Amino acid sequence: MGQKTHPIGFRLGAIRGWDSNWYSETNFQDKLVEDEELRRYLHTRLKRAGLSRAVIERTPERVILTLHTSRPGVVIGRGGSEVEKLKGELETLTGKDIQINISEIKRPELDATLVAKNIVQQLEGRISFRRAMKQAMQAAMRMGAEGVRIRAAGRLGGAEMGRTEEYMEGRVPLHTIRADIDFAQETALTIYGTIGVKVWIHRGEILGKPDLSPNVQAQQRKMKESPQQRRQRRGG
C-alpha cells in the first residue's frame, strides 16, 4: 500500500535509455558492483563539475563511460589534462581499459539531479529551505519546464520535529509514459541531521520512438525485423 512507481524506471525502454548498456552471462554480479563503484567514485571526484549521469557501456576490449555534465571544461581540463588523469585513476580502480566521452548538459536548470544537488548544497550552507526550493522551481519554469515538483523532508530549519514540505508549479503527470519526467533524490547533511530532497521536472512530451543507446537500439531492431526486412536493409 502507498508505494510509488519510480518515474525513470517506469519509462525505461519507452522514452528513456538505460544507464548501464551491457550483457554478461558470467560474472554479472561483479560487473554490476563495478558499475556502482565507478559511479560512486565519479560523483565524488567530479563533485564540482556538475555531473548528472554516467552511462556505462562494455565491450570485450574496454569500458566506455559517457559523462553527462553541465561543466565539461572542468572535467576535460587544460589541454585534456584532467580527463587523462581521471582515465588513469579509473583504469587503476578497475584494471581495465577506459574510454571517456563527455556530453554537455545545455540547460542544467531542467536536470533533476543537478537541481537536487544545488538545493542540497544550499541547505548544507544554511540557506533557507523555502528560498532554495522556490528559486530552483522558478529557474526551471523560466527555462521551459512544463511542471516542477520539489519535496524536502527532515528537521527543516532546525525544527525539533521532522516534517515534509512540498512545492509544485505546473503539470507533473507521473503516469503518462510519453511525458518526459526527470527525477532525482539527494541527501543534505546538516548539523541538525539529514534532509532528503526529491525533485520531479516535467520537460514536455516525447512522441514517437526516441533514439536510445546505440547498442540497445540495434538489439531492438534485430528482434523486430523479419528476415526479408533484414535482407532489404542490407541491400540483398
UniProtKB/Swiss-Prot annotation:
Residues 38-106 form the KH type-2 domain. Pfam families: KH_2 (PF07650), Ribosomal_S3_C (PF00189). Keywords: Ribonucleoprotein, Ribosomal protein, RNA-binding, rRNA-binding. One of its GO terms (cellular component) is cytosolic small ribosomal subunit. The keyword Ribonucleoprotein applies. The keyword DNA-binding does not apply. Signal peptide: none annotated. InterPro entries: KH_dom (IPR004087), KH_dom-like_a/b (IPR015946), KH_dom_type_2 (IPR004044), KH_sf_prok-type (IPR009019), Ribosomal_S3_C_sf (IPR036419), Ribosomal_uS3_bac-typ (IPR005704), Ribosomal_uS3_C (IPR001351), Ribosomal_uS3_CS (IPR018280). Gene3D superfamilies: 3.30.300.20, Ribosomal protein S3, C-terminal domain (3.30.1140.32). Residues 211-236 are annotated as: Disordered. One of its GO terms (molecular function) is structural constituent of ribosome. One of its GO terms (biological process) is translation. Belongs to the universal ribosomal protein uS3 family. Binds the lower part of the 30S subunit head. Binds mRNA in the 70S ribosome, positioning it for translation. Part of the 30S ribosomal subunit. Forms a tight complex with proteins S10 and S14. This is Small ribosomal subunit protein uS3. It comes from Salinibacter ruber (strain DSM 13855 / M31). The lineage of its organism: Bacteria, Pseudomonadati, Rhodothermota, Rhodothermia, Rhodothermales.
